[in-house]
Amino acid sequence: MNNIKSISLVFPLYKDKNTVEVMIFKSLQILKKIKKKFEIIIVDDGCPEGSGKIAQRYAKKNQKIKVFFHAKNIGYGAAIKTGIKKSKYECIFLIDGDNEYNVNDLPRMLKALKNNDLVITYRYKNKNNI
């Protein structure tokens, strides 16, 4: 998958009020450095505490951020599916809105895509807690 020109970054949200702003900020920083066309797709999966409304404030200030809402909580998989359907760019990255995974790893994932069609990453804790 050489020569990626555009990226859609998808965040499913559910009860992520305390992390959504950090995720948006970090994502914008990293995606601007990558220097490719990008969008950030945020899917509020019926959050009862207003995570999506926080994201929507950022979307009003930045047209690269788009927020979609489920009327009620229908699950993580449904939020991902909505995010993928709403994505318009060729390369889609899925990262949870709770800041569990480091968005700073995006450049490494892009590099891995040069020789592969799919890259899956996960956290691993070894005996040294790394």
Predicted regions and their residues:
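A conserved acidic beta->alpha catalytic loop
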Residues: 44-52, 99
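Short beta-strand/loop segment that forms part of the nucleotide-sugar
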Residues: 36-47, 68-70
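Short helix-capping segments at alpha-helix termini
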Residues: 31-36, 58-64
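Acceptor/aglycone-binding surface of glycosyltransferases and processive sugar-polymer synthases
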Residues: 68-86, 91, 100-130
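N-proximal low-complexity "stem/linker" segments adjacent to membrane-targeting elements
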Residues: 1-29, 36
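Acidic helix N-cap motif at the loop->helix transition within catalytic regions
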Residues: 18-22, 49-57
